[in-house]
Every structure is written in C-alpha cells, then in structure tokens.
Regions:
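Structural motif
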Residues: 5, 52-54, 135, 173
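ATP-grasp fold ATP-binding core
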Residues: 98-99, 125-146, 169-182
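Structured catalytic cores of enzymes that bind and process phosphorylated ligands/cofactors
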Residues: 108-110, 121-124, 131-134, 151-154
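Conserved N-proximal alpha/beta basic substrate-recognition cap immediately N-terminal to
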Residues: 3, 10-116
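Short acidic/polar capping segments at secondary-structure boundaries
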Residues: 84-85, 112-116, 139-143, 153-155, ...
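Phosphate-binding site of ATP-dependent enzymes
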Residues: 145, 151-196
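Glycine-enriched alpha-helix->loop->beta-strand junction motifs that scaffold or abut catalytic
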Residues: 102-103, 130, 195-196
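Short, surface-exposed amphipathic charged segments that create phosphate/polyanion-binding patches used
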Residues: 49, 94-97, 121-127, 187-193
Length: 196
C-alpha cells in the first residue's frame, strides 16, 4: 500500500478543517495516510512514498528552515509539489513570472527592502489613480498575516506599514484592492492530470 504524509505544522495542529475528510478519502482510495508536522524532528520522512504539503502555515515566519526541510525531504522521497515549485510559490514574486507569460494578474508593484517606502507608495498610487483602495502585504505571506487594506486617504499609515515590512528585510507588494473579493471571494484552481 502507498503511504503518504499529509503535512501540517506543530503550530497548526487541529486548524486544517479539510484534513479529516481528506484522510477518509485516502482510506477509501486504499492509501495509508498520516498527518505529520513538518517541524517535528522525530518523523522519518523516508518511510513515506509521498509527502503532501497541506497546512504548514508557519512557513512564512520560518522560510529558510522550511525550504531546507523541503530539500531534505525531497532527497528522501517524493515531495508534492516538487521542490522547485515550492520554492517558486512561497514568494509572491511569482506573480511577475505569471504576468510575463501572459497570465492576467492583479496589477502589482513589488517594493524591495532597500527602497524608500513613501515614494514607492506615491508612485504606485499615481499609476493607479482610479483605485479607491489598495493593499499592502509581504511578498512571503499566507492568509492575511501582515496584509492590510487601505483607503487612499490613509497614505501615511500605509507607508508606515510598508516601512515596517521593509525594515524587517521583507519584500512587499502593493496592489489595487479588488471589490470582487468582497462580493465573490477568491477561487483557487487545482490542476490534475491535465485538467482543472
């Protein structure tokens, strides 16, 4: 039987509501699935035929450690997604790659740690004069951690937020806020075996 590890984090134990139904589905499919935390040093990852990233949600605060763990696991067994994809997807700079390949993405300005925050924000607001609201968030982030929505009138609060991110040596991004998120939410697409 195929053994798979469904990866979470010690700090995320019990927070992934989809794990129980996924475990049931794996059992029905004839798989032996176990939930394991990526940051549990007692796990023998080589015992699994595949290690599937599910909810290692603290990776954003421990990125170097997480990527080193991914590299170690991928040297022992199959990591899903593959290591190059994980590395690429952990940093929202991938949006620029997608855009360069013709994929429509939310207009994004990346701001790097050596940049003055207020002029960068003012240039962004000038480029997006029709945006009533905008978002400041870290390039490496999950959920809404350290992300904030601002009205144009909150330029200085947004610049301070941006400065805090940059001062902690984190790249950030600025995007117009899309009201469709309020109305329709966000949709994640999953691509398997050539289809969505």
């Amino acid at each position: 039987m195929t053994r798979i590890a469904l990866v979470t984090a010690i700090a995320a134990a019990g927070l992934d509501d989809d794990l129980d139904p996924l475990l049931d589905a794996c059992t029905r499919a004839g798989l032996i699935a176990q939930v394991r935390a990526w940051d549990d040093p007692t796990v023998a990852w080589g015992r699994f035929d595949a290690v599937v990233l599910r909810s290692p949600w603290d990776y954003t605060q421990r990125l170097d450690e997480f990527l080193a763990w991914c590299a170690a696991v991928s040297a022992r067994t199959r990591l899903v997604n593959p290591l190059p994809v994980v590395r690429w997807n952990t940093d929202k700079h991938y949006l620029a790659d997608l855009q360069a390949r013709g994929v429509a993405v939310v207009p994004t300005r990346f701001v790097e740690p050596d940049t003055e925050p207020l002029p960068a924000l003012q240039a962004f607001l000038s480029e997006h004069a029709d945006a009533a609201e905008f978002v400041v968030k870290p390039a490496v982030g999950a959920g809404s951690r350290d992300a904030q929505r601002y009205a144009r009138s909150q330029e200085f609060a947004a610049a301070n937020h941006l400065a805090r991110l940059l001062d902690s040596d984190r790249s950030a991004l600025l995007q117009p806020y899309l009201s469709s998120v309020d109305e329709h939410g966000e949709t994640a697409l999953m691509y398997f075996a050539g289809g969505y």
